[in-house]
Amino acid sequence: MISHHVIGTLIQAYFTIFHVTYPLIHEETFKAQCHGTRSRPYQRSWDTLFYAVLGVGAWCLDNEDNAFDERLYRRALFLGEDESIFETANLSLVQALLLLSNLSQKRNKPNTGWNCLGLAKRMASSLGLHRELSEWNISPFQREMRRRVWWSLYMFDSSASTTFGRATLLPGREVMDVSYVSNVSDEVGYLLPRLCNIG
């Protein structure tokens, strides 16, 4: 069992260090889901995402407790092995797989990372994240989060392909019509009003 204090420290490390480069999770939403003040997506997917965030947070702290880091990483992977979570693609699971892919590479497990990235790509395509889908009736906030996840996936895939000399998994720009992410902050009360004025 991990104490609330340690969980808070790991989540803060994730958002302070990792999130500034890869803003694929909305900080205030994630923290509200952690505290139970906002509903969580499909439980198993969210649990996988939760432990992936903790694992990346532990890695960001760069402490010498590799056993703890490894335990969090393995817990997230274990939750991701439940085949029922693969029956329905969802944004939380794509986010979790992206984090697991990145963390696997950091842990010198490039093949595991590559395979997690492949699963994330297929789920993202199933969800249509590569398309703007302007006819969909979703909020500007939801649309922005879809863009963030897609372009984070794009960056991870490009980086992994270059690093390992493997073919990119993603389609070329001619197949994608998703817009780039908006340059807005995740601060409370800032992202949503700004996105409501876009367009």
Predicted feature residues:
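Short alpha-helical scaffold segments that flank and stabilize functional sites
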Residues: 58-61, 79, 99, 116, ...
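C-terminal transcriptional activation/regulatory domains of eukaryotic transcription factors
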Residues: 1-92, 97-109, 136-141
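Fungal transcription factor middle regulatory core
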Residues: 13, 36, 74-79, 124-199
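Short, electropositive, low-hydrophobicity segments enriched in small/polar residues
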Residues: 56-59, 112, 132, 169
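Classical protein tyrosine phosphatase
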Residues: 107-123
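Extended, hydrophobic/aromatic-rich amphipathic alpha-helical segments that build helical scaffolds
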Residues: 96-99, 116-120, 149-152
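Short sequence/structural elements of tandem HEAT/ARM alpha-solenoid repeats
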Residues: 67-71, 115, 172
